[in-house]
Amino acid sequence: MSNSMINPSIVNLLEKVDDRYSLVTITSKRSRQLIDGAKSLVDIDSTKPVTVAINEIHEGKITYKTVKEGIK
């Protein structure tokens, strides 16, 4: 499957985050919030949590903070 079949594309999504790992992490955490009952921040027809989360990221509705502290 090429990136052009995914809407929004991976390339466009990577402009909103630091890297692919961050994209996956943010998408999964936001998807879990939606599954647990959080309200969608975008107006789309899909009810799939991952699709909603991806569109929220693409529209700039989701912010995140990179924590530099961690396991050493």
From Swiss-Prot:
Entry function: Promotes RNA polymerase assembly. Latches the N- and C-terminal regions of the beta' subunit thereby facilitating its interaction with the beta and alpha subunits.
Q: What is this protein called?
A: DNA-directed RNA polymerase subunit omega
Reaction it catalyzes: RNA(n) + a ribonucleoside 5'-triphosphate = RNA(n+1) + diphosphate
Q: Which domain of life is it from?
A: Bacteria
Species annotation: Clostridium botulinum (strain Loch Maree / Type A3)
> Could you tell me which cysteines form disulfide bridges?
none
What do we know about how this protein assembles, alone or with others? The RNAP catalytic core consists of 2 alpha, 1 beta, 1 beta' and 1 omega subunit. When a sigma factor is associated with the core the holoenzyme is formed, which can initiate transcription.
For this UniProt record, give its keywords in alphabetical order, as a comma-separated list: DNA-directed RNA polymerase, Nucleotidyltransferase, Transcription, Transferase
Q: Which GO terms describe its biological process?
A: DNA-templated transcription
